């Protein structure tokens, strides 16, 4: 019986891991609102790595601004691009701003559109 329960718990985890890690995004937002940017970055990174577009966007913005982490335009581009590819509209806007200012974009990125 215990093996059956363990099997079902494992199946639920494998089918939809973002549900389990959704609290990382919420906790990250709370940490950011309370001014604890370092903790927010850690929490957003965990959620972003599971594919949470909201967390990817927040992490990208924080990397862009250097909030709670050393400013890194290349990493910011990476996370904003991942969120934008999922259709997250604010990430698309922030990514466009990075591209316009040519910050953090790969050398051949703009050449693709010529």
List the model feature ranges, each with a label:
Residues 7-16:
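Bacterial N-terminal signal peptides
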Residues 35-36, 49-52, 65-67, 72, ...:
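Short helix-capping/linker turns of helical repeat alpha-solenoids
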Residues 21-24, 53-55, 89-91:
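Helix-start (N-cap) detector for alpha-helical repeat units in TPR-like alpha-solenoids
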Residues 24-31, 58-65, 94-101:
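Hydrophobic face of amphipathic alpha-helices that form TPR/SEL1-like repeat modules
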Residues 19-38, 42-43:
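N-terminal leader/linker segments that initiate helical-solenoid repeat arrays
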Residues 1-4:
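Positively charged n-region of N-terminal signal peptides that target proteins for export
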């Amino acid at each position: 019986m215990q093996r059956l329960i363990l099997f079902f718990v494992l199946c639920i985890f494998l089918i939809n891991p973002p549900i389990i890690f959704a609290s990382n995004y919420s906790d990250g937002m709370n940490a950011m609102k309370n001014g604890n940017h370092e903790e927010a970055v850690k929490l957003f990174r965990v959620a972003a790595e599971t594919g949470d577009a909201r967390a990817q966007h927040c992490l990208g913005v924080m990397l862009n601004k250097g909030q709670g982490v050393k400013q890194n335009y290349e990493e910011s581009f990476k996370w904003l691009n991942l969120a934008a590819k999922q259709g997250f509209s604010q990430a698309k806007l922030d990514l466009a701003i990075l591209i316009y200012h040519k910050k953090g974009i790969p050398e051949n990125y703009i050449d693709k559109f010529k």
